[in-house]
Curated annotation (Swiss-Prot):
Protein name: 7-cyano-7-deazaguanine synthase
Disulfide bonds: none
The protein's Enzyme Commission number: 6.3.4.20
Annotated GO MF terms: ATP binding; ligase activity, forming carbon-nitrogen bonds; zinc ion binding
Domain of life where this protein originates: Bacteria
Biological process terms in GO annotation: queuosine biosynthetic process
Keywords: ATP-binding, Ligase, Metal-binding, Nucleotide-binding, Queuosine biosynthesis, Zinc
Cofactor notes: Binds 1 zinc ion per subunit.
Reaction(s) catalysed (UniProt annotation): 7-carboxy-7-deazaguanine + NH4(+) + ATP = 7-cyano-7-deazaguanine + ADP + phosphate + H2O + H(+)
Amino acid sequence: MIRTDAKDGALVLFSGGQDSATCVAWALERYQTVETLGFDYGQRHRVELECREGVREALKRDFPAWSDRLGDDHMIDLSVLGAISDTAMTRTIEIETAANGLPNTFVPGRNLMFMTIAAAIAYRRGLRVLVGGMCETDFSGYPDCRDDTMKALQVALNLGMDTRVVLETPLMWLDKAQTWQLAEQLGGEALVELIRVETHTCYVGERAELHDWGFGCGECPACKLRKRGYEAYLKGERVTEAPL
């Protein structure tokens, strides 16, 4: 059910992936105006950006209650991030775990830059809420996905911009099975199918084969996580509902 008491508009970080697409739907269920924001930073899996418009069009077409709420889309060239990053997300190198215990898919500063730019755009657009798909339940250990990081960043943004912006991370405490379940709660099987077919997660950008859980190579950490979560979701292994 759409909340009619929503007063604040939201800006959603939308990459074209499963998590961020679920966050767009989550925001559409809550706010009268929802805009989306993507970043081109030279990511190896740039195909995800090409999925964004298809997802937006499907949300407008297949979910009439959300259609009028989905507003403008913004795309930011952040190639400087790719230029200063030497990671498996921005270079064609083998995905592996670095000496510090983090996978070499970690892009230092990425979410910090994303949220800072998003806050500046939201300030200009009169939007008070920023929504991101960060999660520290099923995740790769990225420090900029942690709840503490997001809370600290919210404080810094409000101090630095003399405003009152709220950072919402609806997936923070959900595993991937619960994220699929949340999509079903928000938009039924139609939204689950949209996310399965239209979004992209694979780190290497493979989009040649459609698996039960979506497109991807099936071998990279992102594909394995998405596959495992989808299979658990289908089996109903999470008996508690994902919190709306």
